Amino acid sequence: MKILAIDVETYSSIDIKTAGAYRYCEGPDFEILLFAYAFDDEPVQIVDLANGETLPDEVIDSLDNPTILKTAFNANFERNAISSDMYFPNGMPPEQWECTMIKALTMGLPGSLDMVGKALNFEEDKQKMKEGKALIQYFCKPCKPTKTNGKRTRNLPEHDPEKWELFKEYCKQDVEVERAIRNKLSKFETTDKEKRLWQLDQVINDRGVGTDLILINKAIECDLIFTERLQNEARELTGLDNPNSPTQLKKWLGERVGHEVTSLTKDSIPGLLEEAKDDNVKRVLELRQLMAKTSIKKYEAMEKSRCEDGRVRGLLQFYGANRTGRWAGRLVQVQNLPQNHLPDLDDARNLLRTGQFDTIEFLYDSIPDTLSQLIRTAFIPREGNRFMVADFSAIEARVIAWYAGEQWRLDVFATHGKIYEASAAQMFHVPIESIKKGSDLRQKGKIAELALGYGGSVGAIMSMDKSKSIPEEELPGLVKSWRNANPNITKFWWDCDKAAKKAINERTTVCMQYGLKFIYNPGVLFIQLPSGRKLAYIKPKIEVGKYGSDVITYEGMEQTSKQWTTLETYGPKLVENIVQATARDCLGEAMFNVEEAGYKVVFHVHDELIMDVPKDFGKLEEVNEIFGKPISWAPGLPLKADGYECDYYMKD
């Protein structure tokens, strides 16, 4: 198939970081400045659209030709930019595109062109140009009007012709680097199903989800009034110009509690409240707590990223978590929305929409908490539709039991599904009927289930058991009981550890159950999942760890520092990746199946799909059945879904 590689440089006064690509490309002054392209291995060409050049007919025809594959690094942006700036009746259908960034992510590489080039040790002429950031800042964003620049708000090519020529070289170089990455990774096949899943992901992101602008604006207004009132009260009590300033407030508090106050975090304030004798000091600390709780960032993110038709697009990044291939949240970060527990959610929502802020304060414990619980409800279906929400029930627990052949767990999932109760019964040798919701044993079963599936020990339980419901001295016994009750799972951890080490040491392939394989390929360890998809670990080695035993190392992105570095892994961690990746593949199957049945997915969160469906179409039972359909590559995996319908998004 003929390939057309593309990179565009654009201008818009909208900030892409806060608004996202879809809203950015809708900006009234959005335009493509430069269009670099190359067919197959031909030299890269540049079209200077900003200076009146036009795209050759061959390129225009190719953009609309389904037999020519278009590629780009982060193709979602190029698709959006071209659709917005040029007229194509069918837009830029994702099935005619491939994304080299996604290819890099599937190989365990970073998600930026610059870092991929470095990770692959490309020569300088195949690396992204270092001057790029400054050039983008100069030509692609509004500039500050100054006396020196004649009070202009935008830099055009004629304002610095030398920089402009360099910018053209930079744009061409991006195509060179993208092509070099694509060629280097082309020997590693992507399955057809993964290609189709990316295409569906693009359709879902293009589709977007509706938002309630009245609710969003009222939430922002309510927060502003509430925060201003708290700040005024704090000013009166302290006499400080800015009681929000930690430096000023620490000094003021220190003078009144008799010692230096070094921290004002949510963990340190309760201690200060306990020792405070003065009522004013107590109230100031309470105000500080309340001000810290007010977070309307997600409402603001919705407002900024909302497109002209009221929909937010681009909420999900395909393969954003590249150890597992799961999606990552973008813009509103739907993967970590606060839960709603208000019994009268509808009333609270209506009070906010109609601006009855005083009533909200009178009826509910806390305005920040109420606003937080209403965030989900700002997502709304189309006129005449309702949301259908369905998610896999305990999917990771089911997948790990299936892989490990832990029969008692499979029996639980094939029948009543009460895994917390069954786990406690198995661990403490009591009848399951004796364990009721809310009982101590059920709580222990639940915490053990959530903390111990991937090799977790005492530390994992302590971080999971926030309320300290289990005495510390009981924790080692709990770990032992769980592992004794799940011998096949603990065996599976170390079987995977041995398989990975054998594959690396002997440069071979180790086959396990259900088509799970550990495959050594020069420079890469692949874990092939039953679905056929492969997880990649770059430059794997067996090295001596800090405790003197052999450990598996590989190169990857360190999650907190975002640096490309050497990472360690071991059996239980590999099992976590395998299980979560398999659960993700199950979600992919459900996405294909619900779409085929006419249910339109607008976004998804972990193992849950949110579908925007006409009120006279479809049944929840059908959706649950679709989720529970046996998967050909996972024989015997017991899948089950729970679902509900709603007029706005919420947690049931």
Q: Where are the regions that the model predicts?
A:
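Active-site-proximal helix-loop-helix substrate-binding element of RNase H-like nuclease domains
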Residues: 27-33, 37, 41-186, 343-345, ...
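Conserved catalytic palm subdomain of right-hand nucleotidyl-transferase polymerases, strongest
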Residues: 5-6, 73, 97-99, 379-395
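A short acidic-Thr-Gly-centered motif at the start of a beta-strand
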Residues: 1-2, 60-64, 371-386, 592-596
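Short active-site loop/helix that positions an aromatic residue
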Residues: 76-89, 107, 250-256, 393-407
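Conserved "right-hand" nucleotidyltransferase catalytic core of DNA-directed polymerases
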Residues: 1-10, 14-16, 34-36, 119-121, ...
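Active-site palm subdomain of RNA-directed nucleic acid polymerases
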Residues: 185-197, 586-608
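A common structural junction motif
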Residues: 625-635
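Generic long, charged, amphipathic alpha-helical segments
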Residues: 419-439, 547-602
